[in-house]
Amino acid sequence: MAAQTPKTIELAFEELSESQMRARALDFNNLMQRRRTVRDFSSREVPREVINACFSTAGSAPSGANRQPWHFALISDPTIKRKIREAAEVEEKEFYSRRAPQDWLDALAPLGTDSEKPFLEDAPFLIVVFAQKFIVDAEGDKQKNYYVTESASIATGLLIAALHNAGLATLTHTPSPMKFLNTILGRPSTEKPLMLIVCGNPAKQARY
């Protein structure tokens, strides 16, 4: 079978001088070095368009076969946030009391974490990253995605960087298992919850 002609478009690329490259690299490094994980959030509202712009940045991530196998679910409804917190705390109580090996609990001890997750309700936004195993095309045919976890993880990293660049604090949360997120958010079984990102402004008393 003859090879298909690649569908490409002309690259628009901005070439920088060495001094510009150094300046940009240092400025971005200085910005990202100030990123911190936050567990105490203010309920202060965040403009939705800021989050949407960060989603757009995340969508520029490379992906296997350019399939972009991810879905970002944005949650602000207090009722849904409450359901997520309740379900997450059920799993976390199991984790801390039965599932976690002692060395993992020892590693967590200096952070002071436990099964209580008030930040899941306090923060204005929760973002659930779903990795999509398949896509359904315009004809209704199911097509397999490739390098799904790797692709969705790269997009998640860009999202966290974009949120920090926008002046927002984040927390990555991974209760295990996370299938309850599919149920609460009505996502199909072909999508696997990869991460829950808590997003907003830090509380005044926040520490890291």
Specify the residue positions occupied by each region the protein language model found.
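Glycine/small-residue-rich phosphate/adenosyl-binding loop
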Residues: 2, 68, 74-152
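C-terminal helix-cap and adjacent tail motif
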Residues: 2-24, 114, 195-208
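Generic N-terminal amphipathic, Lys/Arg-enriched alpha-helix
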Residues: 7-14, 27-44
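Conserved hydrophobic/aromatic beta-strand scaffold that supports enzyme active sites
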Residues: 31, 126-128, 196-198
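Small-aliphatic-rich amphipathic alpha-helix that forms the alpha element of a beta-alpha
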Residues: 35, 54-59, 127, 133-184
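Conserved, non-catalytic sequence blocks in retroelement Pol enzymes and Pol-derived host proteins
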Residues: 47
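Glycine-rich phosphate/pyrophosphate-binding beta-alpha loops
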Residues: 59-66
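A glycine-rich helix N-cap at a beta->alpha junction
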Residues: 92-100, 185-208
